[in-house]
């Protein structure tokens, strides 16, 4: 099948590469000429495990092409995917400028019937809006061509996107058109062999499903973080509580790990967009507002601990920071807790020596050169001369460090752990002062000192 994907960012590039791997002919179109040129030369513009060889292999095989020519891409395709960004507007709503620009392009250029598939995360009603817009452009040209617009939301996890795309747990196809559904059913047949993963519904329900799924996961994170705050106040250990409630099969262990807050390109944006959508529909969403409020407060928890230990001013203090990306196995720093923490440290007069296995280039892009930030080549280098270690991201290589080296290298044997990676009792035996999230034992012992 011939497929065009508009947008070669995180969602579009993964989708295109996986479809090409299944044997489809895929054209990727983007307005960024440098990005297109880089992909033609084998340079991948983002870090995602397994993506680079997938892109390079299928490009070399001729199944995956990259272009800045939208006319060529529209003419090429039976199916056209829209996979462009929908960044948050100032009021929290999703900015649909890029989506509607693609719709305008399709309407101006299509010469025959098309099925347009929206992969971008968009508000309810966007499929209808895109269809109307394309139809208007066709009418301007005096054309009335067959057209279907389908909602086909993505459910990829950054850091596991290729695996999620190759082995989806569900494929939602939102359309009332039997023709469009049949085409997508054929497209996704290689992913649907062992069991039927396809869920057909109307487009509006498909659009809401995407937002509801992310809001549900964000709610679980904020819930466990609120319980962590209570555990601290009561002298309980949230890690034991987590195991206890997770053992209930109705709850399970997914997304109940306490920490210094969620970030990334999806959860913060989508919760706000859903709140905005509900407001426009005249619905109150006190639960969703609380989810967002708890998360924003959680991102400041480590800073509160720093002030508790070192005082209001951090002037003359330097902190080692492990983990800049919002989660492991990605270089994405969008709304990452590390950014909130670093910026608060700088505002209090402190300095940061940071290390992340993948996000150093992104940190340089965001912050440039500044005297209060040193980006280090290794996690050990970041420790040198630091007053304490701060952990913001649970990369595997941070889970079992050389604690003897750590204690010898830091000025003071202090760890502020935003991901609960370490055992408080063992660290105490090694002579560390240890602050974690929701581990009342770790805090109680510091207060006794």
Annotate each predicted stretch with a short phrase:
Residues 1-449:
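Structural/interface elements that position substrates and couple domains in central-metabolism enzymes
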